Amino acid sequence: MKITVFKNFQDRKGNYELVKVLNAIKEGKFNKEITQLRNADSEEEKGRIKNSLLAFTPSVVLNTGRKFTDGDSYSGIIHLDYDKLNDVAGAIDKIKALEYTYSCFVSPSGDGIKVFVRVSNEMEQHKDAFNTLRSYYDKAVGRESDKSIKDLNRLCFVSSDPELYLNEESVVFDYTTVSTTRTPEELWEYTSRKETFTVGNRNNFIHFFACNA
C-alpha cells in the first residue's frame, strides 16, 4: 500500500510504502520536531512547527501534485482523526480492540489519535465507505472524529509514537456488508476468538466485548 509524502503541503517528496512511514513514526525519526511541537508555549508556535512537518496522503497515490489526476490511484486505506481527547490511552485501547484497525498512533499534538483501516471499496465509493467507517468507530470510541478528512487527497501529518500499533492481519472493512451495529451473539462470538472468559481474565473479556458493542 503506497502513499505520497509532501513537505510544506505542496512540495511532493515521492511515493512510499505506508508501512515505511509508520515505521519511521514508531522509530522516532520525527521525535525532535514532535517534542518541540508538544512543548511549544503558544498556539502560533505549535502551528508553525506542525505546518513544517512532513505529511502524507493515506488514501491516494499522487504522481504529480496535490490534485488528483487520471494517472493517480486509490490506496485502499481510510484514515480517521480523533482530537482533543481526555484519555488518549483509553481511546487507543478501544481502537486496538476493533478487528478492522490496521494501525493507529498518537497525533503530533499528543492529545489525539490517527487511525488507519484497510478497505475493499473502489475510489468512487470512498466517501460512502468513510462515513460508514467513521460511524462504526465513533460508536466504539465514544467520541466523534473529524468528519472533514473525508477528501481523497487529505493530508495526515507524521508524528512520533514508540507504541504505534500495526496489525498486518487486520480485517479489511467492506462498508456494504458491515453494519454499524452487531447482535450480542455476534459480539460474543468475536470476543471469544480474541479472549477467554476464565477466572483471572474475565475483566479483559468484558472490556473487549464492550469495546466492540
Residue ranges and their predicted role:
Residues 1-4:
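Boundary/junction segments of secreted and surface-exposed precursor proteins
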Residues 7, 13-16, 27, 31-40, ...:
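Modules that initiate DNA replication and primer synthesis
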Residues 21-24:
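Carbohydrate-active enzymes and regulators
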Residues 33-34, 39-49, 53:
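Small cysteine-rich, disulfide-bonded extracellular modules of the LU/uPAR three-finger superfamily
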Residues 50-68:
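Short, solvent-exposed beta-alpha or beta-beta edge segments that form flexible loop/patches at the rim
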Residues 103-109, 146-151:
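Short beta-strand
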Residues 116-122, 147-169:
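Short, conserved secondary-structure transition motifs
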Residues 169-176:
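Short, low-complexity export/processing leader segments characterized by acidic and small residues
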